[in-house]
């Protein structure tokens, strides 16, 4: 999947072949039974399961075959980037980060793809390839509509009107911006609180690392 996404035809980096082994080690060392991930990671999980099966055939029942835990909402299983094309990826520069402040989120939302362009808001809108509506599908709630856009009861009502025309993409982006920032505000607050005690963060990481080493050592 990664090779296709990056359009590697030749001179494929060794990391593309070795990284699945490294990921499998991170999972199996702790005998994890469930791995929360997006559907783009399903091939990697299958590689891990195959490695576990072959290892256990040789050395006995030592490792555990993990299962993938996908988000309940199908749209969240492979959330596209803000460009509406590839998956959200740091290397592709199409991400909204949990650490982004409100101004940064709005800057990114304004640049989000609306799918097929329209000459005016009176023209019917298009949902296919429209990253704004994909994100609304993933994150908006009926309560968000009641708070920020009471003209519509829910996302389905907005969609019905949007495809008929009369709703500007800018208005939809403003609504999405409100939805995202409402969700991110508590995260920002908590992050700020932790930033005031960096030594404690390192202390937590140290304790976690020690516990992880102990667990992995038992498996090894």
Please name every model-derived segment.
Residues 7-11, 34, 121:
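A short glycine/serine-rich beta->alpha loop
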Residues 43, 49-220:
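Conserved nucleotide- and phosphate/pyrophosphate-binding catalytic cores
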Residues 1-24, 143, 179-184, 188, ...:
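N-terminal Rossmann-like or analogous alpha/beta NTP/dinucleotide-binding catalytic cores
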Residues 13-55, 59, 80:
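Internal, conserved structured core segments that host functional sites
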């Amino acid at each position: 999947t990664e090779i296709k996404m990056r359009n590697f035809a030749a001179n494929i980096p060794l990391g593309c072949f070795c990284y699945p082994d490294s990921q499998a080690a991170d999972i199996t060392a702790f005998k994890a039974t469930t791995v929360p991930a997006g559907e783009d990671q399903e091939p990697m999980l299958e590689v891990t399961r195959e490695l576990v099966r072959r290892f256990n055939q040789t050395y006995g029942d030592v490792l555990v075959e993990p299962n993938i835990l996908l988000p309940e909402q199908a749209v969240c299983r492979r959330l596209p980037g803000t460009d509406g094309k590839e998956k959200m990826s740091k290397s592709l520069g199409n991400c909204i980060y949990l650490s982004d402040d409100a101004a940064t989120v709005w800057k990114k939302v304004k640049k989000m793809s609306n799918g097929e362009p329209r000459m005016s808001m009176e023209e019917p809108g298009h949902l296919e390839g429209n990253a704004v509506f994909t994100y609304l599908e993933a994150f908006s709630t009926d309560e968000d509509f009641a708070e920020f856009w009471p003209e519509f009861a829910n996302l389905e009502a907005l969609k019905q009107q949007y495809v008929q025309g009369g709703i500007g993409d800018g208005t939809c982006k403003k609504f999405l911006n409100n939805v995202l920032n409402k969700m991110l505000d508590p995260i920002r607050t908590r992050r700020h609180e932790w930033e005031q005690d960096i030594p404690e963060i390192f202390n937590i990481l140290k304790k976690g690392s020690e516990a992880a080493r102990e667990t992995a050592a038992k498996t090894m």
